[in-house]
């Protein structure tokens, strides 16, 4: 049985990955489509391009205004405006369209920010004690804080599910589905037992965000060779993927909360197992 530390009492206590409602998930996909369509448009200054209503994890009504800002130094950030407010209707998010990279990366970045937006610790449950140890300029107080643990782990697990779904839809025989299941088990054992990752598992984690993949038809066709023919992954570059570095950073600064991630991962693996075994 997993023993949770006291600090987790300040976090929504779901033991599985947090999922947006089907309605909010659809809205997020649509928002991703609209923002992706703007990636090549010349935007000289910060402009408001969208709004989205959603629900927080405690059921409160929330809304975010979405801005594109080509001068913003980071990829994206969701915050409350004014910062002193705790009204979930007052979220503002800005993104730098020059940093979008891939469409998968854009979606998962938005997903990460909405994990913050749905977290009542930003709004209806905000308190000084919870935030006093949070400092984005200090690794231990940023990566080691429960608010980033929640956002990063849910972002990764959502991406993992989506990547296995995508690959499962492209395979056409039982043998290839068994290969996917073996990689899924390998990824679980890597995080739980330190088992080395196979080349295919590395490729799967790398494709979660299409890290470094150029936005061209040829680049996507070449990248999908290992998707359609998993055995070719043995010839792929085995550099450490971004999400592997990210989750290992979370582990480094959240050793007490790490068992919670493993429980979330185990449940997610079961979810993916069911998807693959159904062949859909």
Predicted regions and their residues:
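Proteolytic processing junctions in secreted/extracellular precursors
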Residues: 3-15, 30
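N-terminal low-structure segments adjacent to metalloprotease catalytic domains
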Residues: 16-19, 23-27, 270-280
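Zn2+-dependent metallopeptidase catalytic core
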Residues: 25-60, 114
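Active-site scaffold of zinc-dependent metalloenzymes
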Residues: 65-104, 114-121
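A structural signal for well-ordered alpha-helical segments within the folded catalytic domains
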Residues: 104, 108, 112, 145, ...
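Post-HEXXH active-site segment of zinc metalloproteases
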Residues: 104, 120-148
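Catalytic phosphate/metal-binding cores of nucleic-acid and nucleotide-processing enzymes, i.e., regions
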Residues: 109, 114, 123-127, 164
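Pan-zinc metallopeptidase signature
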Residues: 153-280
């Amino acid at each position: 049985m997993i023993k949770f530390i006291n600090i987790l009492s300040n976090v929504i206590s779901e033991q599985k990955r947090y999922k947006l409602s089907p309605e909010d998930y659809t809205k997020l996909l649509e928002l991703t489509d609209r923002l992706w369509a703007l990636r090549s448009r010349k935007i000289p200054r910060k402009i408001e391009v969208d709004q989205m209503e959603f629900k927080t994890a405690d059921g409160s009504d929330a809304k975010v205004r979405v801005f594109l800002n080509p001068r913003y130094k980071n990829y994206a950030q969701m915050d409350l405006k004014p910062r002193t407010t705790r009204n979930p209707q007052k979220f503002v998010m800005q993104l730098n369209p020059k940093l979008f990279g891939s469409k998968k990366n854009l979606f998962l970045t938005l997903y990460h920010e909405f994990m913050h937006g749905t977290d009542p610790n930003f709004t209806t449950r905000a308190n000084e004690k919870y935030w006093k140890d949070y400092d984005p300029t200090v690794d231990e107080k940023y990566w080691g804080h429960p608010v980033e643990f929640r956002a990063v782990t849910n972002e990764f697990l959502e991406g993992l599910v989506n990547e296995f779904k995508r690959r499962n839809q492209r395979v056409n025989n039982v043998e290839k589905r068994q290969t996917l299941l073996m990689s899924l088990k390998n990824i679980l054992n890597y995080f739980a037992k330190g088992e080395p990752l196979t080349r295919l598992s590395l490729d799967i984690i790398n494709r979660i965000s299409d890290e470094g993949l150029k936005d061209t038809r040829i680049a996507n066709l070449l990248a999908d060779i290992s998707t359609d023919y998993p055995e070719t992954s043995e010839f792929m570059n085995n550099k450490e993927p971004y999400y592997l570095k990210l989750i290992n950073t979370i582990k480094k600064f959240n050793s007490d909360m790490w068992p919670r991630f493993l429980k979330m991962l185990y449940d997610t693996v079961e979810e993916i197992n069911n998807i693959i075994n159904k062949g859909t």
